[in-house]
Amino acid sequence: MTEETISQAVPPVRDWPAVDLPGSDFDPVLTELMREGPVTRISLPNGEGWAWLVTRHDDVRLVTNDPRFGREAVMDRQVTRLAPHFIPARGAVGFLDPPDHTRLRRSVAAAFTARGVERVRERSRGMLDELVDAMLRAGPPADLTEAVLSPFPIAVICELMGVPATDRHSMHTWTQLILSSSHGAEVSERAKNEMNAYFSDLIGLRSDSAGEDVTSLLGAAVGRDEITLSEAVGLAVLLQIGGEAVTNNSGQMFHLLLSRPELAERLRSEPEIRPRAIDELLRWIPHRNAVGLSRIALEDVEIKGVRIRAGDAVYVSYLAANRDPEVFPDPDRIDFERSPNPHVSFGFGPHYCPGGMLARLESELLVDAVLDRVPGLKLAVAPEDVPFKKGALIRGPEALPVTW
């Protein structure tokens, strides 16, 4: 991209540095970009050049659902990005466009339907009760992240994936190394290769499986020649890693509820509003730093009067879309009565997060178990003293010290 490829009226390129924001603070750079206009230009700490940034709710939905913007073309580019290393596997579902993307997602769709998610509800509730039991037996103080918020999502996603309980620790370790930007490219790539090898073996053993877990569904699809083993492994890795996002989201959720006890007390006294309240918290929580994966414009497209040329890189900000005042009145306020609430915390369009329904289930189970079974729960330190992750792409508390 060069200045000559675009018109004179384009916004200036804004540097967006990598910073570790305190708590659940909204990124001030993103706030400024939202004020500058619906379509701006950014340069992130890594990669090359600049990219467009789209922040309004309707435009974010347009870009993510429009075949004129593709992911596959990103593979051969060093698009400006937050992550210091870029190690996607060619053919991975996150970098495929329809129809290949649709074919691959179809292979595991059954596991993420309402029926598929309900299949693990009671087992998930049982595993969560065991974790809360253990925390209560040990007595206060406790680290809610270590005791509950970290092991629970790992157990649930491993259950859904068909990963044996004995391998959960390895999965968690690999995921943390892949998601962190502080260990360097070699460490992240080695962790990803080890997870790839693990799923290659596991899926390969299940080519004749009739099981309902994800690796069985993938193994059966490979056995029917609907997808390749490489495609199956790439999808399994993405789903496994994504499953742990609940740890960070729920960590921010409980940090917020315990920092503002009136919110937690309302959820205790009005349990019927919990599903709606969780949706509002999912909208409000800034779950990541900066932006995620880019897209490439496959032809010239005009958005809000700005011409995006074929070949230009484009990012959307789901965080910004969730604070669009045209869609969410008083967007910075947490409003448990907000309805409708068309947030895009799980994305939109063909790349919508397949685990969105599972994440909602886990969040509801966590709120029920923690608030109902530990009524005196409170932070053991001041809210501003809760340590948050540093050098990470996904935001969340490193630990959540609590007492009761």
From Swiss-Prot:
CDD domains with a match to the protein in the record: Cyp158A-like (cd11031)
UniProt keyword Metal-binding, yes or no: yes
Note: The structural studies suggest catalysis likely occurs through proton relay via a 'proton wire' formed by water molecules in the active site.
Domain of life, source organism: Bacteria
Catalysed reaction, written as an equation: 2 flaviolin + 2 reduced [2Fe-2S]-[ferredoxin] + O2 + H(+) = 3,3'-biflaviolin + 2 oxidized [2Fe-2S]-[ferredoxin] + 2 H2O; 2 flaviolin + 2 reduced [2Fe-2S]-[ferredoxin] + O2 + H(+) = 3,8'-biflaviolin + 2 oxidized [2Fe-2S]-[ferredoxin] + 2 H2O
InterPro entries: Cyt_P450, Cyt_P450_B, Cyt_P450_CS, Cyt_P450_sf
Name used for this protein in its record: Biflaviolin synthase CYP158A2
Single GO molecular function: heme binding
Keyword Membrane: no
EC number(s) stated in the UniProt entry for this protein: 1.14.19.69
Cofactor: heme
GO annotation, biological process: pigment metabolic process
Pathway: Pigment biosynthesis
Keywords for this protein: Heme, Iron, Metal-binding, Monooxygenase, Oxidoreductase
Residues annotated as binding heme: 353
Pfam families in the record: p450
Binding site for flaviolin 2: 288
Residue sites binding flaviolin 1 per the record: 288, 293
Job of this protein: Catalyzes oxidative C-C coupling reaction to polymerize flaviolin and form highly conjugated pigments which protect the soil bacterium from deleterious effects of UV irradiation (three isomers of biflaviolin and one triflaviolin).
Protein family per UniProt: Belongs to the cytochrome P450 family.
Name of encoding gene: cyp158a2
